[in-house]
Amino acid sequence: AIVAGMAIGLIGAWRRGTRLDAGILMLALFTWALPTFFMGIILVLLLGRGRLPVGGMVTPGLEPADGLAYWIDVGEHLVMPTIAMAIVYTGEYILIMRSGVMEVLAEDYILTAKAKGLSTLRILRDHALKNAMLPMVTMIALTFGYTVGGAIQVETVFSWPGLGRLMYDSVQKRDYPVLQGTFLLLAVTVIIANLLADILYSVLDPRVKAE
């Protein structure tokens, strides 16, 4: 989702004002507005008719001792939950990346690079992308927390035995110690993600390192 959102957002910003940009913007807004559980239900209806497994983590009867067949089966069960969450978050990344690149492309040094005759690819790669990554780094760090909220819905739709499903079941059973543990894990994950984001900031923006 991150790679796709960055690439599509970059293209949309470079071709801003065109039909391609309008199509990308509509696609991003549409996918961003979709609830993750609704996306999961749509995938079940489209891909679940004998093509891919629609629930659980593994086909009943398979064990880790079965070797490669077990892990292939787990991968097949993971396809639809992964796609459901990736589609929704891709739209958000497209909008953030598009906005960041459009802001950078209006800077004077981009106009100077164009005046020097640099190619479009080099301008985007060497000048625009790095500076437009700062808002993306923040959003990626915040997504770690949001992902658990989306995972609760997706794991419930697909009956996937993960952290989100554990939180959902704990709420239903009023199992407060388990809820406290999952909330603590979530908080630690968000703190670590924000710490990594601050470190990446210093790498991408030397002014942060100087401060």
Each predicted region: which residue ranges?
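Alpha-helical transmembrane segments of integral membrane proteins
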Residues: 1-20, 36, 61-211
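Membrane-water interface segments at the C-terminal ends of transmembrane alpha-helices
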Residues: 26-56, 77, 84-90
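Conserved active-site segment immediately N-terminal to the catalytic lysine
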Residues: 23
